[in-house]
Structure formats: structure tokens, C-alpha cells
């Protein structure tokens, strides 16, 4: 979609699928599995050594502490820099698209409550959807898988 629209992707996935698909403006709320951090500075990422990608107890980060994956584990806080960027992108959106999410994982589900009044909300999911509690935004549900649903939405948006 970036070839025709300004797009910011906010993802809870730790993989690099969006980048491999050509997306350039991706906010990884839960970190990136293909990067490392340290136990001392878990929000400062650096590239994994491609020749030695495994992490072992005793492997040291540049700051001397244990290496860890650059991901957010259950009950860990999201990096505030990434959360603020997500909130800002949401508040500036003309169109907000949710693809294949239960909308139950917080704090990401809170973003739906921050969508501007004039912003259109589209939800692409083959199943029935329920907005998070407290979110009363009207939405258009494209009951489809991600690829087909995004193609359908792209065609719709091009007509506007």
C-alpha cells in the first residue's frame, strides 16, 4: 500500500514480515526477534551476529551484561518511545486499519480508543470481531483474510 498511500504499520509481531514485504515505516510494539538487547538496557537494540545468532548464558552485550532478545515478555513494559510513536501515528491517521487481530492485547488495544473522530476504521478479519471495551468507534468489517482484504480495501480507498 505504500506505493499509493502514506502508511505507518504498528505491529505486535516480533518478526520482520512487514519489512520483507517492502514496508518501510514499521513500529514494532513488542520488539524485534531478529535483534538483541542487554539485560541492563533491554530497550536498546542492536543487530544479531548473523554468523552466531544463538544466545547462550554468559554471552555478553556491548555494555557487559547478558545478551537477551529484543522482545517484550509477558508483564514487561512496552518501550515508551515506541508507544508514543504509535499513539502519535494513531492520532494523525485518516484511515486506521486493523488486520487479523483479536484486539484484546493491551496496551495496543487502547489505540482504538485514540482514533480521531473523522478517521475511518477498517477491520480485516475472516471472523466476527468485537471492539475492546469502551471503544465505540464505527467501523467497516472486511470479512476476509489479510491479503484479499487489503487488496479489497486498497481498491476502495483509491476510489475516494
What are these regions (language model features)?
Residues 1-160:
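Conserved catalytic alpha/beta core of Sir2/sirtuin-type deacylases, generalized to analogous enzyme cores
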Amino acid at each position: 500500500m505504500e506505493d499509493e498511500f502514506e502508511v505507518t504499520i504498528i505491529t505486535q509481531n516480533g518478526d520482520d514480515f512487514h519489512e520483507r514485504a517492502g514496508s518501510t515505516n514499521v513500529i514494532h510494539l513488542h520488539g524485534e526477534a531478529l535483534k538483541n538487547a542487554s539485560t541492563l538496557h533491554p530497550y536498546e537494540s542492536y543487530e544479531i551476529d548473523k554468523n552466531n545468532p544463538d544466545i547462550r548464558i554468559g554471552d555478553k552485550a556491548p555494555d557487559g551484561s547478558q545478551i537477551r532478545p529484543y522482545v517484550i515478555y509477558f508483564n514487561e513494559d512496552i518501550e515508551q518511545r515506541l508507544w508514543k510513536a504509535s499513539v502519535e501515528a494513531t492520532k494523525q491517521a485518516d484511515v486506521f486499519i486493523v488486520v487479523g487481530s483479536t484486539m484484546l492485547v493491551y496496551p495496543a488495544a487502547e489505540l482504538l480508543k485514540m482514533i480521531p473522530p473523522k478517521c475511518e476504521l477498517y477491520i480485516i478479519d475472516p471472523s466476527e470481531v468485537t471492539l475492546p471495551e469502551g471503544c465505540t468507534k464505527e467501523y467497516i468489517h472486511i470479512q476476509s483474510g489479510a491479503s484479499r482484504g487489503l487488496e479489497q480495501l486498497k481498491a476502495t480507498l483509491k476510489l475516494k
